[in-house]
Structure formats: structure tokens, C-alpha cells
Swiss-Prot record:
One family name in Pfam for this protein: Zn_ribbon_CSL
Gene this protein is translated from: DPH3
Origin: domain of life: Eukaryota
This protein's name: Diphthamide biosynthesis protein 3
Location(s) in or outside the cell: Cytoplasm; Nucleus
Native species: Yarrowia lipolytica (strain CLIB 122 / E 150) (Yeast)
Organism lineage: Eukaryota, Fungi, Dikarya, Ascomycota, Saccharomycotina
Residues of the signal peptide: none
Length: 69
């Protein structure tokens, strides 16, 4: 699997209402991944508008900060 980039979870923006983390994509849209997917061990965020993917770099304990939001 080929990634556009590897992004630290701290650099992503959390939308508490939707439970997703986003990161700007070069196409103008945003890479997205659900917090629940991260909890399940998924680490690939995809852009819904193009074929690019990023790998989210995180430790499981990093997810706790988003549950407190």
C-alpha cells in the first residue's frame, strides 16, 4: 500500500460532533478517519475526493484525548 504521507495524530483536526479526524489533502478536500476506526486499529485515512491515503501515526493512549473532548 502506498501512502501520500505519514501524519502524526497531533497534526490532525478532531470533529467531536462527527467523531472523525481530518487532515488537509492537496486536492482541496480532507483526509478522514473515524475515531472508532482508529480504536479498532485502522491507521489509514482516505480522501473522499481523490485516491490519496495517509498513514496516521499514533499510540493507542493518544486516542484518550479525543474522548475527553
Amino acid at each position: 500500500m502506498s501512502f501520500y504521507d505519514e501524519i502524526e495524530i497531533e497534526d490532525m483536526i478532531f470533529d467531536a460532533d462527527q467523531g472523525i479526524l481530518t487532515y488537509p489533502c492537496p486536492c482541496g478536500d480532507k483526509f478522514q478517519i473515524a475515531l472508532d476506526d482508529l480504536k479498532d486499529g485502522e491507521e489509514v485515512a482516505v480522501c473522499p475526493s481523490c485516491s490519496l491515503m495517509i498513514k496516521v501515526i499514533f499510540d493507542p493512549e493518544d486516542l484518550e484525548q479525543f474522548e475527553e473532548s
